[in-house]
Amino acid sequence: MIGSLHEIIRLDASTLAAKIVAKELSSVEITQACLDQIEATDDTYRAFLHVAAEKALSAAAAVDKAVAAGGQLSSTLAGVPLALKDVFTTVDMPTTCGSKILQGWHSPYDATVTTRLRAAGIPILGKTNMDEFAMGSSTENSAYGPTRNPWNVDRVPGGSGGGSAAALAAFQAPLAIGSDTGGSIRQPAALTATVGVKPTYGTVSRYGLVACASSLDQGGPCARTVLDTALLHAVIAGHDARDSTSVEAAVPDIVGAAKAGESGDLHGVRVGVVRQLRGEGYQSGVLASFQAAVEQLIALGATVSEVDCPHFDYALAAYYLILPSEVSSNLARFDAMRYGLRVGDDGSRSAEEVIALTRAAGFGPEVKRRIMIGAYALSAGYYDSYYSQAQKVRTLIARDLDKAYRSVDVLVSPATPTTAFSLGEKADDPLAMYLFDLCTLPLNLAGHCGMSVPSGLSSDDDLPVGLQIMAPALADDRLYRVGAAYEAARGPLPSAI
């Protein structure tokens, strides 16, 4: 009989869901075990910004009541608790986006992702820490302090969604939701030995996802196994009329693909290794782990060839013009007049002065930096030289990928150039921080889908390494087939704690 905290929190989500249905464990027991783990460990890891214990237990009790009555559960994951990145709006919890300017703010509506989680009977444990407004690669830019990596508390968990990844690695939650603007799901997953997926742009609603860069942002699932990630992906995916960027195409059978992949047969699958995403600047242990993963894919029956994506060399420059440009526009709404922080409103100052004081006090250094870069790139006289050119490069990157997929089914690369770096190591060097997104951001520019799946520990420092699997738009099922096959062949890995 499974019942101890140590045993419960280490079970994967699909196992927990089966035990709820079989009445071997209750959702309340599972949720309480996660809450106990959060209480015991989060002073160290700081994965959560807000914990909603009573609300989570109430949602869990509703699932248990349905099980006891013999009724049909609302989803395969009903009763399995989840950690939600604090960039998705929630009516019953604060939504801060890791920023002082939204401290204590409650949204008047739930994000579509939040609504779908609730409808699926998934208890929400709370909101997880993140880089302010999803701007960062380490979760050090949170106004509420950094999250620490459970594998080594002196290292970062990645960003911007380091809180969700750390919660999974620390066994505080079996499921999590993140958002990915340039790698903010996949990169933390790689650094914490968890699984993270950036779905095809437009297939998971952005309604209620507080915008960083609207053409790049995409919500997605995180878990500790590929199958669990697929099950969660299926819950949140689908068209939403309230999101103008939502696509109406049918969601592929990602759960079926994950289950098929567990057989370990990749015969007929063509895999491309991106030449531009390895080599100089990559940690030797990361490259060794990547090469071993490629050899494992070959052993499973896949054919592997090298693929050239020449415009990837310009992806970083294009991304860091497009993203700040959209940031400068999106964050103009935080003006002290409509919601959030208001500073200096004592009747003696003009509206312009109040806005300036509020934004100066409410935004952190990285957010201010990107607003300034974006405003410059969009200004008269520079638009054609910078922003317009970056959009042309974006088109060329998408064409590189389209050409690649004529000869292969998926692409692979390391998910990050190195393992987790030390807290504070890149804090004063924005360019070094930006370079850490090198492997992941091309997919956001193209709107394609990608997954990071653990590929072992680096021989350099015994820290996790992630294998990135990429597929064309609306071919998310390919990620799950290849990812599940690789995961099954790779075998179990040690845990962080």
Curated annotation (Swiss-Prot):
Determine if Secreted is one of this entry's keywords.
no
One Gene Ontology term of the molecular function aspect: glutaminyl-tRNA synthase (glutamine-hydrolyzing) activity
Q: Which reaction does it catalyse?
A: L-glutamyl-tRNA(Gln) + L-glutamine + ATP + H2O = L-glutaminyl-tRNA(Gln) + L-glutamate + ADP + phosphate + H(+)
Task: Give the enzyme's EC designation.
Answer: 6.3.5.7
Question: Tell me, which GO biological process terms does this entry list?
Answer: translation
Q: Which residues form the active site?
A: K85, S160, S184
The record's top EC class is ligase
Q: What Pfam families does this protein map onto?
A: Amidase
Q: Which SUPFAM superfamilies match?
A: Amidase signature (AS) enzymes
> Which keywords annotate this record?
ATP-binding, Ligase, Nucleotide-binding, Protein biosynthesis
Give the Gene3D superfamilies listed for this entry. Amidase signature (AS) domain
Can you cite an annotated GO cellular component?
glutamyl-tRNA(Gln) amidotransferase complex
Looking at the record's lineage, which domain of life comes first?
A: Bacteria
InterPro entries noted in UniProt: Amidase, Amidase_CS, Amidase_dom, AS_sf, GatA
Q: Which PANTHER family match?
A: GLUTAMYL-TRNA(GLN) AMIDOTRANSFERASE SUBUNIT A, TRANSAMIDASE
Q: How is the subunit organization of this protein annotated in UniProt?
A: Heterotrimer of A, B and C subunits.
UniProt record similarity statement = Belongs to the amidase family. GatA subfamily.
Q: What does this protein do?
A: Allows the formation of correctly charged Gln-tRNA(Gln) through the transamidation of misacylated Glu-tRNA(Gln) in organisms which lack glutaminyl-tRNA synthetase. The reaction takes place in the presence of glutamine and ATP through an activated gamma-phospho-Glu-tRNA(Gln).
The molecule here is called: Glutamyl-tRNA(Gln) amidotransferase subunit A
Name the lineage.
Bacteria, Bacillati, Actinomycetota, Actinomycetes, Mycobacteriales
